[in-house]
Amino acid sequence: MISSNDFRTGTTIELDGQVWRVVEFLHVKPGKGSAFVRTKLKSVQSGNVVEKTFRAGESVQQAILEKSNLQHTYVESGDYVFMDMSSFEETRLTSEQIGRGAKYLKEGMEVNVIFHNGKVLEVELPISITLKVTETDPGVKGDTASGGTKPAILETGAQVMVPLFISVGEMIKVDTRNDSYLGREN
């Protein structure tokens, strides 16, 4: 159990059968009446964000999460197979469990998988990864009327917008949180 007075950004709690992460919190002490804690909670499973108010000192069940560092080994019949590098146990995850990060997975990549009561809650990819451009239109010199970017398909099948000077075969860094181009990789 955790007191609502101890809430911090990133604290995970169990509420109504779901696991929630505290995104924002504010301790309020009105001049009249008792103190309370106003929070913004994000569901780890669905991503929904709700606002909830707790009485000051109210006890809430803290969610106990396990974080494992797993390496993506291969894909078999639609399932992504990961291996725990310390115990060599295999874990199979579907693309729904991995979420939007599945398009960036390549063999040998290490990810953090967060478990709650033995069930996968989320898969954390590295913030930036380096991938090879496999398909893109050639950049025409002086063609900047469209904003200076063009679509490119990467080695994993992901599509990102890149500057006009990027060509097929180049290695680029991509931000996995918002699918944005970060720069060339030497």
Swiss-Prot record:
Pathway: Protein biosynthesis; polypeptide chain elongation. SUPFAM superfamilies: Nucleic acid-binding proteins, Translation proteins SH3-like domain. Keywords: Cytoplasm, Elongation factor, Protein biosynthesis. It holds the Pfam family Elong-fact-P_C. Its main location: cytoplasm. It is found in: Cytoplasm. GO terms for biological process: peptide biosynthetic process. One of its GO terms (molecular function) is translation elongation factor activity. GO terms for cellular component: cytoplasm. Belongs to the elongation factor P family. Involved in peptide bond synthesis. Stimulates efficient translation and peptide-bond synthesis on native or reconstituted 70S ribosomes in vitro. Probably functions indirectly by altering the affinity of the ribosome for aminoacyl-tRNA, thus increasing their reactivity as acceptors for peptidyl transferase. This is Elongation factor P. It comes from Prochlorococcus marinus (strain MIT 9215). The gene is efp.
